[in-house]
């Protein structure tokens, strides 16, 4: 029943499209990054970038840069997988791999409708792969991280704003409820401090 509902996304396809930007730009890359790391990355004017480490938010531009590197690792693996699948599809349609890679007007003019559609898919994923490689350059990575700042912007006063929450390595306690106020740590609480003991 669920699989037939409008808007259903199959588990194997979920997340795949979100790795590919709507447009191949700094803003496009920033949006895919934030979509994947929304619960791990935050920015305030007072602190610069913060990354959630599973227990608390720590100020660390380097940790956020590492998150972007991890993001481009996943994107590159997806791009390589899609390029290979597109090349295999072209081979299945009778187009040699090297001819597809070389391309050119004469080559494109020789394709039938199905081959043209498959070749366009190959070109799209090749463009995505080149785009990801571009963003693995630190300068371009910095541009995407700068573009992401307004998307993950928080008011500095939102950090540690609830004085009734005590963050520990083993979870967060809502102090008015004492030991019964325990809950797992939650990045939405925006806690930047943690006790040294549980």
Question: Locations of the language-model features?
Answer:
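Repeat-associated, polar segments at repeat-unit boundaries in modular proteins
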Residues: 1-13
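Intein modules and their embedded homing endonuclease domains
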Residues: 10-198
């Amino acid at each position: 029943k669920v699989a037939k509902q409008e808007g259903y996304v199959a588990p194997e396809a979920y997340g795949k499209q979100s790795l590919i930007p709507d447009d191949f730009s700094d803003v496009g890359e920033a949006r895919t990054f934030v979509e994947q790391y929304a619960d791990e990355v935050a920015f305030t004017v007072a602190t610069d970038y913060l990354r959630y480490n599973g227990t608390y938010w720590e100020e660390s531009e380097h940790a956020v840069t590492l998150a972007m590197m991890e993001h481009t690792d996943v994107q590159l693996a997806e791009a390589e997988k899609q390029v290979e699948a597109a090349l295999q599809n072209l081979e299945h349609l009778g187009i040699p791999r090297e001819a597809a890679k070389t391309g050119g007007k004469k080559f494109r003019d020789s394709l039938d409708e199905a081959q043209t559609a498959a070749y366009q898919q190959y070109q799209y994923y090749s463009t995505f792969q080149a785009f990801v490689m571009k963003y693995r350059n630190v300068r371009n990575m910095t541009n995407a991280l700068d573009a992401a700042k307004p998307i993950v912007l928080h008011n500095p006063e939102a950090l540690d704003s609830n004085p009734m929450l005590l963050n520990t390595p083993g979870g967060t306690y809502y102090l008015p409820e004492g030991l019964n106020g325990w809950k797992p740590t939650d990045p939405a609480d925006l806690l930047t401090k943690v006790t040294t003991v549980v």
